[in-house]
């Protein structure tokens, strides 16, 4: 019907919406730009080709250019909550970054951030994106500046697909089975990865479309992304079974000459999760338990409810 067609189109904000959004400009300190300075620290290079990634058939599996309407120099539209707009602006700061000595990150090649930690002989990859294609592109960008270092280790910090799905973009089954590359994950990782992404994956995927507004057009009257990131890539999701499971807090493991000290965090942002500390680099990774977002204790897509008491304890232990 004509009415249904009209209802499907974005509408201008009501006066009430404008007033509520404008009120946030007074309630929060938007003059503080420290987060923007922090997010740009160590910047090396922008994502090549606008960040667009294609598969072997030439199909686009990742296209961040659809979110170019968001920029750090652009004012918040009156259709958008200013706090959400600010978060989206921070997410638009993508590329290759050097976060500290021997640690690099590629941001903006998927929902998650992929990290590269340089060992004695090669590089250890932490959380290799959703798809093999985006992880491969991130590794290529890192190697452009750091050289063709072999991947000597992969760490899955937790059991969500955006932290392991691209593993075959950074290593091979042969390198893993031969011992050239170790894959480390928290105890219970495989069971939880399968239960959420395979057994419940179809139902959760459908609910995610409502939760994230995946089918809504990108734009200030549509969707700005998924909050934690923009969206997920649509490439090849892969999984290589971990060769080493971490079972208890305080467990230490040396990977490519670097000692890792692990802290278990099951039942936090994911059912199977851990944090780790690298004493030699004075570097701490808290997976997705200390992000600049509201802690996602419950997701509308139907992931397992997280234990807020445990989560808080892991961050203060």
Label each PLM-derived region with a short phrase.
Residues 89-149, 274-278, 282-288:
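Conserved beta-strand hairpin/beta-sheet module of binuclear metal-dependent hydrolase folds
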Residues 121-122, 132-182:
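Active-site metal-binding motif and surrounding structural segment of the metallo-beta-lactamase
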Residues 110-113, 130-133, 158-163, 189-191, ...:
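Solvent-exposed loop/turn segments at secondary-structure junctions
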């Amino acid at each position: 019907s004509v009415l249904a067609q009209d209802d499907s189109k974005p509408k201008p904000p009501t006066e009430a919406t404008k007033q509520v959004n404008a009120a946030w400009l007074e309630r929060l300190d938007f003059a503080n730009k420290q987060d923007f300075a922090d997010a740009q620290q160590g910047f090396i290079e922008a994502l090549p080709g606008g960040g667009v990634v294609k598969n072997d058939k030439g199909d686009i599996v990742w296209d961040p250019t659809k979110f170019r309407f968001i920029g750090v120099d652009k004012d918040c539209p009156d259709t958008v909550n200013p706090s959400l707009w600010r978060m989206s602006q921070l997410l638009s700061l993508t590329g290759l970054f050097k976060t500290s000595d021997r640690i690099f990150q590629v941001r903006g090649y998927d929902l998650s951030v992929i990290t590269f930690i340089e060992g004695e002989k090669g590089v250890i990859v932490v959380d290799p994106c959703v798809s093999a294609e985006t992880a491969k592109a991130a590794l290529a960008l890192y190697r452009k500046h750091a050289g063709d270092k072999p991947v000597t280790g992969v760490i899955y910090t937790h059991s969500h697909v955006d932290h392991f799905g691209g593993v075959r973009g950074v290593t091979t089954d042969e390198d893993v089975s031969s011992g050239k590359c170790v894959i480390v994950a928290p105890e219970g990782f495989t069971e939880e990865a399968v239960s959420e992404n395979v057994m419940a994956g179809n139902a959760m995927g459908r609910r995610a479309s409502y939760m994230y507004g995946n089918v809504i057009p990108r734009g200030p009257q549509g969707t700005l992304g998924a909050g934690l990131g923009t969206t997920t890539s649509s490439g090849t999701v892969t999984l290589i079974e971990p060769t080493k499971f971490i079972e208890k807090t305080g467990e230490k493991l040396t990977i490519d000459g670097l000692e890792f000290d692990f802290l278990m965090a099951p039942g936090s942002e994911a059912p199977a999760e851990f944090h780790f500390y690298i004493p030699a680099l004075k570097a701490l990774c808290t997976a997705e338990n200390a992000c600049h977002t509201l802690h996602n204790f419950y997701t509308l897509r139907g992931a397992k409810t997280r234990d807020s008491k445990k989560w808080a304890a892991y961050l203060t232990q």
